[in-house]
Amino acid sequence: MEGVEKQGHRGPFMDSTPLIYEASLVDSPIICLNGRFLDQEMTGVQRYARGMLASLAPGLQVLRPKVPLSPARGHLWEQLVLPRRCGRSLLWSPGNTGPLTKANQVVTVHDASTLDHPEWFSGKFAVWYRFLLPRLARRVRKIITVSQFSKERLIATCSIPDHKIAVIPNAVDARFQPVSAEAIEDFRRRHRLERPYCLYVGSLEPRKNVSLLLKAWADLAPPDCELILAGTAGHVFREKGFTDLPVRTRLFGRVADDELPTLLSAARVFIFPSLYEGFGFPPLEAMACGCPVICSNSTSLPEIGGPEFDAADPASTGAVLYFNPTDREQLAHQIRRVMEMPPEEARRMSRNGIAWAGRFNWDRCASQTWAALKELALS
């Protein structure tokens, strides 16, 4: 059947993770997968969907467009073509959207940001999602979301009952782990990273609150350290009140997936000042690489980041320092605290982070998701 990913075949835009399917099960599927995400740019949603696709048990029929489509044409394919190709089988849509005409469907909705803060998005994008999500959430059989925070916001914004939403947290890919000193040294040399650095990884858009980080960094102005911003530049730099980058700040651009663990492992501290996250992959990925984390205390982030690090308590399992995302002085204080931290404290924070991130694995996430899908497919 057209659009089915079978064993040994990998379409364009796929990463290097093997896809494990048994042909006999693919030929007689009970669950179809909305594979539109396979042709989209890699973000947290696409990372989740690909991780799930690589980990799930056999039995999925992956339906995707024949060729990569523009966003507008992708929406048309999803709404008009996908439900016909799926037929009566259960459809799982892992990337926030799905066809409105398909009631026998499970949708993974990662957050309610378009409903809570439409001003953060382009006009057309916000209008479409504000029209689609509440109607889709009320029509389909089940919603999966990735945090208790997102569940509460979806209940409030979409007017759906508690029992219709299952919370299944995301996971951290196994490639995020501490790398060797030799690999770090080679990476530093190739990218001319001569000083110790603090790191932010993510898109540079208003809700990520990078402008607050830049202002806190300007207040600190540490002479022996630089701030690395890894991600695509956006209109955050045109916000009123901020026009120039502080000294010792470097725009690193987009990081290749295979280099991201090294970039994280080599950092002095990872800083995540986001105003709104349905889950938040980057802090957990940094923890998994042994990098100390400073994180906003907003939305889902305390739920995902776990207990705060307590240097005075040897039994503390915390791996993160939190701050109010509107308080630049508090952020500057936390950065200074990590930079002045005794080596043993930093190592303890690092060990705690590796242990905490280990709780979020794809096998657990996939098994819980598969159980929910199979129960609905057989009922």
Residue ranges of model-derived segments:
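Cationic, low-complexity basic patches in intrinsically disordered or flexible, solvent-exposed regions
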Residues: 7
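Carbohydrate transferase catalytic cores enriched for Leloir-type hexosyltransferases
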Residues: 10-379
